[in-house]
């Protein structure tokens, strides 16, 4: 009996070990500087066999942040319930890494509409804008300034969420058969807040 219990815990221990190693690696990368080299042409510029792309520009209500939003729609007929849709933050970096091989894999199942929400820059990240857009307001005041060497205004996530919900999503989804029960929002680092 003991041997059976031991064998059944071994996979769990292995999974725990691998997840622990992954956590250590990822935590070391938190302190790494992002690669801020200018981006070249992306999949929307090159074209895809599996998706067709469009891009739209938006400005923040206060006019200080400028967004580029790419929409990738599968080249297949929408399911009866509509396409699932995935909004992805850090859209410039997403578009730089998105390729036809991944789009092919997505199109083999129920392909989602992909919406990459980025900024009007040729860099992978607009560090100041994303620090503001992706962070919640401090309880003591509406916006805050991160202190330290790289001071950035923060606390604009409510404004950004309102932009996503009231301007970007309605414009992107206009004319598309979308399954509103299968919407997702993806982000990492600040974008995961």
Residue ranges of predicted features:
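Serine-hydrolase catalytic machinery in alpha/beta-hydrolase-like enzymes
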Residues: 82-163, 167, 171
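Active-site loop->helix "elbow" adjoining a glycine-rich segment at hydrolase catalytic centers
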Residues: 160, 189-192
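Alpha/beta-hydrolase fold nucleophile elbow
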Residues: 177-188
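A domain-start/cap signature at the N-terminus of enzymes
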Residues: 31-83
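Bacterial N-terminal signal peptides
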Residues: 18-27
């Amino acid at each position: 009996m003991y041997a059976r219990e031991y064998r059944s815990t071994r996979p769990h221990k292995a999974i725990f070990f691998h997840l622990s190693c992954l956590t250590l690696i990822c935590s070391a990368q938190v302190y790494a500087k992002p690669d801020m080299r200018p981006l070249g042409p992306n999949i929307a510029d090159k074209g895809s066999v599996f998706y067709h792309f469009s891009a739209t520009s938006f400005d923040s209500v206060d006019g200080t942040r400028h967004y580029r939003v790419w929409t990738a729609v599968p080249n297949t007929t929408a399911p009866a319930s509509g396409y699932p849709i995935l909004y992805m933050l850090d859209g410039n970096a997403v578009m730089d890494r998105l390729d036809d091989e991944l789009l092919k894999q997505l199109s083999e199942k129920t392909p989602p509409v992909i919406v990459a929400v980025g900024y009007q820059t040729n860099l992978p990240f607009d560090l100041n804008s994303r620090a503001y857009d992706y962070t919640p307001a401090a309880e003591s005041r509406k916006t805050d300034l991160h202190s330290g060497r790289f001071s950035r205004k923060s606390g604009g996530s409510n404004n950004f969420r309102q932009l996503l919900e009231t301007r970007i999503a309605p414009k992107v989804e206009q004319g598309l058969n979308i399954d509103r029960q299968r919407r997702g929002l993806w982000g990492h680092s600040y974008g995961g807040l």
